[in-house]
């Protein structure tokens, strides 16, 4: 199906482009959301008449998104989640979680605007892209930790997972030393009894 785009759409085109898309994509997404018109003579004329208004509306939306992006720039959202000793989360952090954290911090971010390549499954700092408009994108930091104290340590640059592993290794070494000492002591005692 041929459609006329009313706004810039990634991997499809810019305002006014006439592109071919699958029927379902046009009928179920582009047309109902007001992102495109069916490409026929009537709609081509209508688009040309309304082109300036459409471009002005898109420019206003882009400017509003740019203002929000300037506010979001450098923002760090802290998410407290349960995790194992290795730093592996029991669940995962999704786009919805990031959007809710942004809302709680007073920013207006839609879940669909958050771009995660894959869910976050470990504690630590992650960079997440937020696309507020087709032409406006911003990177934010997501700090996933088991407690607010860990989150503060991570913000200062400490690698919590490495610290946990070092702590676990030190504890294992200490226990191994205690076991070796106990075995040596038991060996000495055994020699006295015989």
From Swiss-Prot:
Source domain of life: Bacteria
Keyword Ribosomal protein recorded: yes
Basic and acidic residues composition bias: residue spans: 185-194
Record's keyword terms, sorted: Ribonucleoprotein, Ribosomal protein, RNA-binding, rRNA-binding
One Pfam family cited in the UniProt record for this chain: Ribosomal_L9_N
NCBIfam families (UniProt xref): L9 (TIGR00158)
Name of the protein described by the UniProt record: Large ribosomal subunit protein bL9
Organism: Hyphomonas neptunium (strain ATCC 15444)
């Amino acid at each position: 199906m041929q459609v006329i785009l009313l706004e810039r759409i990634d991997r499809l085109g810019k305002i006014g482009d006439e592109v071919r898309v699958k029927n379902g994509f046009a009928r179920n997404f582009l047309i109902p959301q007001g992102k495109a018109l069916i490409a026929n003579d009537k709609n081509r004329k209508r688009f040309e008449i309304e082109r300036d208004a459409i471009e002005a509306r898109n420019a206003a939306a882009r400017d509003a998104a740019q203002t929000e992006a300037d506010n979001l720039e450098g923002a760090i959202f802290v998410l407290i989640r349960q995790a194992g000793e290795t730093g592996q989360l029991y669940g995962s952090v999704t786009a919805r979680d990031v959007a809710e954290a942004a809302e709680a911090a007073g920013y207006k971010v839609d879940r669909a605007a958050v771009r995660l390549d894959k869910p976050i499954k470990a504690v630590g700092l992650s960079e997440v892209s937020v696309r507020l408009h087709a032409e406006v994108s911003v990177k934010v930091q997501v700090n996933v930790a088991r407690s607010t104290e860990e989150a503060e340590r991570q913000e200062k640059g400490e690698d919590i997972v490495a610290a946990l592993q070092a702590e676990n290794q030190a504890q294992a070494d200490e226990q191994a030393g205690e076991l070796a000492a106990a075995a040596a002591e038991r060996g000495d005692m055994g020699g006295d009894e015989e």
